[in-house]
Amino acid sequence: MIRFDTLLFPGGLRRAFTLSYDDGVTQDRRLAALFRDCGLKCTFNLNSGLYGHRFSKKVARLEEDALDEIYAGQELGGHGLTHAALDHLSGAPLAWEIVEDKRRLETHSDRPLIMFAYPFGTWNDAAAEQLRMAGYEGARTVASTGDFRIPPDFLRWDPTCHHKDPKLMELARRFAEEKAEEPRLFYLWGHAYEFDLEDNWQIIEEFCRYMAEHAGDFWACTNGEFIRYVKAHRSLEYSVDGHMIFNSSALDVWTQTDAGPACVPAGGVLRR
């Protein structure tokens, strides 16, 4: 067996798809139901200091007692206690905005939060470092890449595109139908209230139906699931001759070898 170090996703797949929606608004109820119906996974990024806050007739935050029902089966992510621009904060106010939000949200999660979305998409190195110290492992920006690359730094994670991108369906077809030689990630983000404000729910409904039709071709995951899996793959340990691979993580990990796709079991060894 020759080590290739090529990341594969569960089942030996070469494609992964994840979603990220911000602000914890009332329209998330409809959106989360759509994702569940289509077998998709999303990280919903909330501001725990703004539960129930109404901004306009069509934009209102969910009450806290609705979270467990609406986001069942999905992932919660941090978005700052009050949606403050983190690059305008420092010291104790920056720490409080991040850490207190995380503490509150974790009362509605079955595991520690590791994913964050930068409010307004703005950040600096101090904010990223504060997130790391708080236990976050990933943070999404709003800078679209237009491609399917896997980020080298999850705390500065640029998504593929926003759902309003005019090339959304073109990107979906490229992702699902083009031959994938290297691992691919499609990362879509947005705000659910935009569908009501712009009366265009058909955009996300058409997109999700298309992705559901190709469900067997990609791994649908939350942001946090993706991070944990990729880090588990990166932590694989190899013998000098490449005939033995040890997986110290709690996740089964797939990788490409000269013999084809192979699963290295959690806590186990793959030998050839």
Q: Residue spans of the language-model regions?
A:
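Boundary/entry segment of secreted carbohydrate-active catalytic domains
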Residues: 1-27, 258
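Hydrophobic "anchor" residues on beta-strands that sit immediately upstream
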Residues: 18-19, 75, 218
